[in-house]
Amino acid sequence: MSVIGRIHSFESCGTVDGPGIRFITFFQGCLMRCLYCHNRDTWDTHGGKEVTVEDLMKEVVTYRHFMNASGGGVTASGGEAILQAEFVRDWFRACKKEGIHTCLDTNGFVRRYDPVIDELLEVTDLVMLDLKQMNDEIHQNLVGVSNHRTLEFAKYLANKNVKVWIRYVVVPGWSDDDDSAHRLGEFTRDMGNVEKIELLPYHELGKHKWVAMGEEYKLDGVKPPKKETMERVKGILEQYGHKVMF
């Protein structure tokens, strides 16, 4: 019996969630509560719609030409895709049979290391790992949970030599300070599997979703970081031998 997945939506020709042109599936459900989340409507684990791997593959193969020509592929995003690891594993297996590159965009909040996680990673070409904040106290205030599980997953990926791009959102007043950047650099310094760090400037593009759901957007008034701030954080991380982009 095939596993059923629950998704929020998909994007057929994404260009910012992995290399090349990508088919991105936004999976429903997330256990983090990031104050800056721009997909607030993906949190509910019972929301979205049910799909099968076959449903997704019918869509994916339609865009195979664009993916192949650009060095692209598929990306499992969210919400948090790893909450549906069994389904994502099956979807990625189907993609690999078609020669399609696979990317897992995750916050790394892994609750249990069972064989499914390893089976998923075996068919994952790239993991884009969101490291929100290395200071656990700030992390808990920013996203609602400890960073312990995410950092353990980062170490797990390093030990298995899984190719990783780290994503770090630069939020003024929360993650734009020198200490936070140095902590990130120190943590990842010896992780040879990390190809690069992507700095993502904070934005308010998802604010309207919070408002539509009748909820307070607690970062209201926080402005995107200035270019000088991004350059400063980039410079600190480069001191640790990383390729850094924004």
From Swiss-Prot:
Pfam families per the UniProt record, alphabetical: Fer4_12, Radical_SAM
CDD domains: Radical_SAM
Main EC class the enzyme belongs to: oxidoreductase
Cofactor or coenzyme needed: [4Fe-4S] cluster
Top-level taxon in the UniProt lineage: Bacteria
Xref: Gene3D superfamilies: Aldolase class I
Description of how the protein assembles with itself and partners: Monomer.
Family recorded in the similarity comment: Belongs to the organic radical-activating enzymes family.
Protein name as it appears in the record: Pyruvate formate-lyase 1-activating enzyme
Annotated organism of origin: Escherichia coli (strain K12)
